[in-house]
Amino acid sequence: MITKKIRVYGIVQGVGFRPTVSRHAAAAGITGSVCNKGPYVEIFAQGEEKCVKDFLEKLENQPPKRAAILKINTEDVKEEEYGKFNDFQIIESEKTKGEIFVSPDIAICEECKKEMYDPKDRRYLHPFINCTCCGPRLTILDALPYDRERTSMKEFPMCPDCASEYEDPATRRYDAQPVCCNDCGPEVYLIGRAERGRAAIIATRKMIHDGGIVAIKGIGGFHLCCDATNEEAVQRLRALKNRPAKPFAVMARDVEAVKQECLVNEVQEVILDGHQKPILLLEKRKKSADSTDLCKSVAPGNPKVGIMLPYAPVQMLLFRYDDGIEMPDYLVMTSGNTSGAPICRDDKEAVEELSQLCDLILSHDRKIRIRADDSVMDFYKGEPYMIRRSRGYAPLPTMVTMPWKGQVLAAGGELKNTFCIGVDGRFYLSPYVGDLEDLRTVKALQETIHRFETLLEVEPEVAACDLHPKYNSTVVAEEQGLPVVKIQHHYAHILSCMAENDRKEQVIGVAFDGTGYGTDGTIWGGELLLADYHGFERMGSIEPFLQIGGDISAKEGWRIAVSLIYQQTQDKEQTMEIVKKLNLCSEPECKVLLAMADRKMNAVTSTSAGRLFDAVSAILGIRTKSTFEGEASMALEFAAEAYEKEIWEIDEPADGESDPDEEKKEPEDRLIMKTGSLIKYLTEKKTEGIQAEKLAYIFHQKLADLIICGCRKIRKKTKCNCVALSGGVFQNRLLLRMVEEGLEKEHFTVLRHHLIPANDGGIALGQAAYAMQYIQEGK
């Protein structure tokens, strides 16, 4: 007989790990115990050597579905040291100091679905059904280790039946912390009305069926919901939210309903119906003109729709109940917030912010501790390509195999904010927080940072933030009472890509996005950097231009277009003539803008690739203004993709001047990608009547050529052969593919993002990685 002490590290809390260990022990015929220590699970395994070996094999090869084992440490111990075990027991959790891995929330499992719709089951139609394999985790946590008394479920004592299941190793709810039923669990209710429980769900379903709008409290916050097949309801929601064109997310009844509206491959289907259930950006099927399914106003002018399946029991009950109401197969399910604010998480916020946007508010009395918006995922070359990393994924750690020691906090960016906590080589990116231009979101950021530091039991040594002095994220970092490390925005993008890909050596970083404060005080956004964790050098950029009009220029691409045209012509009359032909703006507007350009009034020098895309979209007559971030750029991408489907290859050069092997040099010897010549070419061809879609495609192709050429020249100078692609512009899959494939043809190693967003939702990871290196160097 032998006894082993085993410590298992990783995502081992809130995933049914201890019950699984107990079942493996019973199957292997060993005795001992399992205890949740916080940073790890500690197991004592006692029995014949073969039995203990069998147990260890099961532990390694058959962990719970939702667990993630990072390492297992084993040591032999003497029987007299711990005594003889008569059976195998789950020991009450013990608080142990150290880093703890937190499980994300888990979508409802198939077994719970079956029980919920079984009239003979005691949890029939229960809106909060869960087990060890599914249910809320991160969003209900007060503290760790993960036990009921440290979650918001502590307010709901278990009834005798639930307690019996909780204590029985043979059940699926053995040691399931959120376990509850209709008798002892939380309850749904309508705010401001008398209906509770069943009556509240029926009233909500009827309101949606009749064309109304409802706010619904889920796992990580509220959603605004209406019938996605009802044009009038969707248009009303757009008007109330002041959201004229930005796509709404859709929740479909089941996989078959998704397939009716979207093209779904095997990989997408697995993720769609998996345990994380993000919103997937899927290509719409071509429908007949008289189709009465998903209405066009859900995602107007967009070849894709963001769609997901129900992941919370209450969401499933919206589609299927026993009240005889026939519900649609598709519901709009958009974040429950007002513009700029964080997602609402409690009744007070819902009443204050959502009551004017909806007809009913369906809430419940299980408190949400940490907000978690839905994750959003695109696909690139058949692989997941994360756009927003939140529910279901955060805060799973990103591992970097550098010999780092220390603890850091990174406050992230101003838009699409997430923050990151780094512990040695492990980095915990938070759920999506939002845009920090709204002070309510800033408050949410501060609260969530505090809660994460408490949960993970960390005490950061430094706080990292963006270089921009006026960002609210910078202010939050400075308020931490820690040494502050400021990291240039695009450098952080590249480090984020390096960290996700566990790249240790130097890279050529291509950082293309909308805006970022440069080290020279200008706006950057189309950058070629030489970077590693020690620092970076700006090797090149797109051709600088004047961004006139301040923040409004980010919404009105025609302003950038006029500026770029004027930069090429250097002649007011000629510029006004071109602007008139392109119908970019009125003559008085053009005159004012040109005067501002001459005086550099409310104008900044910029190398923003995002604004370049907006300008080209305006020049080609695709979009002159944007009602939401990225609208004009997305429309340009869609136009180019539509043209690509019609042709195999374009071999038409822009002209001699736009040859990517020619380049300008600034006094400091920075490589300048000649985007100005490309603008001149596009302007000329558009005024000649060339198809906008064709020109959109040429723009993508020639911009990719310029990037590839720039990387080639930097390689020649530096011998660096690895390129990292990051920044929100690389959410454009056409440009990403053109650049990646072009670089690979030139025998570069190419790094890109996968499950960390390329946009600003990922830069906190890069900030944290730099801060960790900063600590090692003792700066």
Question: Which ranges hold each PLM region?
Answer:
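Internal gly/pro-rich beta-alpha loop/helix module
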Residues: 62, 165, 323, 327-402, ...
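Conserved phosphate-binding/catalytic loops in two-lobed NTP-binding clefts
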Residues: 466, 481-493, 721-724, 733, ...
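A contiguous, well-structured pocket-lining segment that forms one wall/lid of small-molecule binding clefts
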Residues: 178, 185-187, 413-451, 563-720, ...
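Intrinsically disordered, low-complexity, mixed-charge
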Residues: 1-178, 182, 189
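Conserved phosphate-binding catalytic cores of ATP/NTP-utilizing and phosphoryl-transfer enzymes
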Residues: 259-265, 317, 343-348, 374-375, ...
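Glycine-rich phosphate-binding/hydrolytic loop that grips phosphoryl groups
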Residues: 491-512, 516-518, 557-566, 701, ...
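A phosphate-binding glycine/aspartate-rich beta-alpha loop in the early core of alpha/beta enzymes
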Residues: 76, 159, 221-286
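Short glycine-rich phosphate-binding loop at a beta-alpha junction
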Residues: 215, 457-469, 718-729
